[in-house]
Structure formats: C-alpha cells, structure tokens
A protein has these predicted regions:
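Conserved SAM-binding loop
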Residues: 46, 124, 144, 199-200
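Short, acidic loop-to-helix structural element flanking the phosphoryl-transfer center
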Residues: 114-144
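Acidic, Ala/Val/Gly-enriched low-complexity intrinsically disordered segments
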Residues: 7-12, 24
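Asp-based, Mg2+/Mn2+-dependent phosphohydrolase catalytic module
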Residues: 13, 19, 27-36, 133-134, ...
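A metal-dependent, Asp-based hydrolase signature
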Residues: 78-115, 134
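Active-site neighborhood of HAD-like aspartate-dependent phosphohydrolases
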Residues: 30-73
Length: 255
C-alpha cells in the first residue's frame, strides 16, 4: 500500500521533531554534541609554573611572618592573584587594607616575573606540543583560559603563542574560577557554542568553572583529586584527541 505523499511528509517531520526533542532534552545527557573547541588552562596543563608561584607566594608570606606550605599552595590553584593573597592572609590571621593587598599582589608578581624570566621552551609539559598540533590538524579551535595575567609572557617564552586561536587571561576577566567567565569568553572568541567546547584543567575550581559554564571537563592529574571531571588523565601525552573523545563517550560527546 502506498502512502499519501502528504501523510508521508507529515510522518517524517513528526519523527524528526520527536528525535530532536529527545536529543536536546536537558539534564539527562541525551544531547549529542559535536566537539569543535578545546579550552586549556595554563598552569599545570601546558606548563608547570605552579612551583614558581609557590616560591613567590612563599617569599611574600615570609615577609609577613605567615606560615605557608606546599600543601597550602594547593588551595591557590586556579584562582586569581587577589583571591590567592586573601587565602594566605586568612591562613596567617592577617588583615590588610585594600591598598596594602594591592601592594602585596604587585610584590608577589614582581618576584614571580623574576622566576619566569628563566623559563625555557623545554619546560612545556610532555605531550603538549603534539596534542595541540594534532588538534589543530584535525580542525579544532583552540583557546587558553587562565587566571594568570602573565599568560602571554609565558606562552611567548615557551614559543606557543601560535598554537592558540584565542587567549583569555587575567587581564580580560574580572571573576575568578569557579566562575565560568574565562571559559565562556574563550568559547565566545572562538565563535562556538559553549556546549561544543571541552575544558582541560588541573584544578577542582577550574573543573567547576567548566561545569558552571555548561562545558565538559578533562582533569589533568589524579581521579582522587579531580573526581568532578568527566575524564581524568595524567597529562596530554597520555592519549590522542581521538582516544580522549572515546573516553568521553559516556558523556554523550561526539567528535
């Protein structure tokens, strides 16, 4: 029996609407999204400058007679310079005026800049250059999303500026992670929907920022420390972009 063409067309249209509704149903991981953009944090993902931040903050803390350990430094990952200072002051039970805080931030940054002047291209973390090159060859857009105000200086020293289509750093954002501002701006500069972007982060606050912005996150580190990430790898050397997207299949992301 041959169906009336109008009936057939209506059936096809209704079926399409039903499938589209199911796949776009929010909150139940049904939405199938094509990944087009990759957003990377800087410290701990591209290069390990955390040690230099720690040494600079340690010097500042010593000036104020505030005990500050490497364990305390873990609390500063992924947050702004001012927020980091406030955490240190809280540890020491020290209160300062806004002007004094600004001065402390400048002193810390001056110390830090002296350290990163010694930064060498060889300090790029293992697998980073190949991962970025492969991603670009595959047609992905790439952005940096970092709280650091020294991101351009660091990338220049590492000869990685040309690896990124957009750089969002501490000079462009007002809100610290876990606020999603840095990643939302990254997606905007790449001219992509936020759902089409994956974030690479080494800090819980950064992963929360990705989630707050409606993006999936890949943790760089251990699953114990980054249990809130959709996937977790020890470094960008560990998987190719294709292998990683397969790992994220459970999150309904398609490449």
């Amino acid at each position: 029996m041959q169906l009336n063409p109008k009936v057939s067309a209506l059936f096809v249209y209704n079926s399409y609407c039903m499938i589209r509704t199911i796949m776009e149903k929010e909150g139940e991981n049904f939405r199938m999204i094509e990944v087009k953009g990759l957003l990377f944090d800087l410290d701990g993902v591209i290069v390990d400058t955390a040690k230099y931040h720690y040494l600079a903050w340690k010097e500042l803390a010593d000036m104020r007679n505030i005990p500050f350990t490497a364990e305390d430094n873990e609390r500063l990952k992924g947050v702004s310079r001012m927020k980091s200072l406030e955490i240190i002051l809280e540890i020491g039970g020290v209160k300062l005026s806004e002007g004094e805080k600004e001065q402390c931030c400048r002193i810390k940054n001056d110390i830090y800049l002296q350290y990163i002047k010694k930064l060498k291209e060889e300090e790029v973390l293992p697998g980073v250059k190949k991962f970025l090159a492969d991603a670009r060859e595959r047609g992905y857009k790439i952005a940096l999303g970092s709280a650091s105000k020294n991101a351009v200086e660091i990338l220049s020293r590492l000869k990685l500026m040309e690896a990124f289509d957009a750089i969002i750093d501490g000079t462009k954002v007002k809100k610290a992670k876990p606020d999603p501002e840095v990643f939302l701006l990254g997606a905007k500069e790449l001219e992509l929907d936020r759902e089409a972007c994956i974030v690479f982060e080494d800090a819980r606050a950064g992963i929360e920022a990705a989630h707050n912005g409606g993006m999936k996150a890949v943790g760089i580190g251990t699953k114990d420390h980054l249990s809130n990430a959709e996937a977790c790898i020890p470094g960008l050397y560990y998987m190719t972009i294709d292998e990683l997207l397969k790992e994220l299949k459970a999150s309904k992301i398609q490449s």
